Amino acid sequence: MSTKAIYPGTFDPITNGHIDIITRAASMFDRVILAIAASPSKKPMFDLEERVALATTALQHLPNVEVMGFSDLMANFARAQQANILIRGLRAVADFEYEMQLAHMNRHLMPELESVFLMPSKEWSFISSSLVKEVARHAGDVTHFLPANVHQALMEKLK
């Protein structure tokens, strides 16, 4: 039986921390979908098409990973993709409370949907897309935290 997992998020933009999680998930499951949420209420810097394109390029070295955009409830998207595993990254204890609420709601909406929590490697444990964008806005060097294509796109957006 083939295992299919979904790693959802806004990924505005995708960081090396996200790539760390997805790379490890790709070694655990037969197929992994990086599901990029439209998230219009978050007012993303990059639109959905841009985020999908950036992530697709950054993840092209992982043959069992597919990048898709979505705007539905996660449980509905998972059901439509016939996936029953949800990957979530936990950077710190503070993330756990919110992630636990999401996991319980997703389980309520789709009882067969299991949430699997992965901690990022120590090197990436403190970064987030929001933090990287904030540092970049103030001319800080974020090269180390982003794939090259994403770094270039971020610098273009900030011009």
From Swiss-Prot:
Kindly state which keywords UniProt assigns to this record, in alphabetical order: ATP-binding, Coenzyme A biosynthesis, Cytoplasm, Magnesium, Nucleotide-binding, Nucleotidyltransferase, Transferase
InterPro entries from the xrefs?
Cyt_trans-like, PPAT, Rossmann-like_a/b/a_fold
User: Mind telling me which CDD domains this protein's record contains?
Assistant: PPAT
Give the binding site residues for substrate: T10, K42, M74, R88
Q: Which reaction does it catalyse?
A: (R)-4'-phosphopantetheine + ATP + H(+) = 3'-dephospho-CoA + diphosphate
Q: Where does ATP bind?
A: T10, F11, H18, G89, L90, R91, E99, W124, S125, F126, I127, S128, S129, S130
Q: E.C. number, please?
A: 2.7.7.3
The protein's location, in the record's own words, is: Cytoplasm
Q: Which domain of life does the UniProt lineage start with?
A: Bacteria
Co-factor(s)? Mg(2+)
Name one matching Pfam family: CTP_transf_like
Family, per the entry?
A: Belongs to the bacterial CoaD family.
Q: What does this protein do?
A: Reversibly transfers an adenylyl group from ATP to 4'-phosphopantetheine, yielding dephospho-CoA (dPCoA) and pyrophosphate.
Question: Subunit notes for this chain?
Answer: Homohexamer.
Report the protein name in the record: Phosphopantetheine adenylyltransferase
Q: Taxonomic classification, please?
A: Bacteria, Pseudomonadati, Pseudomonadota, Gammaproteobacteria, Enterobacterales
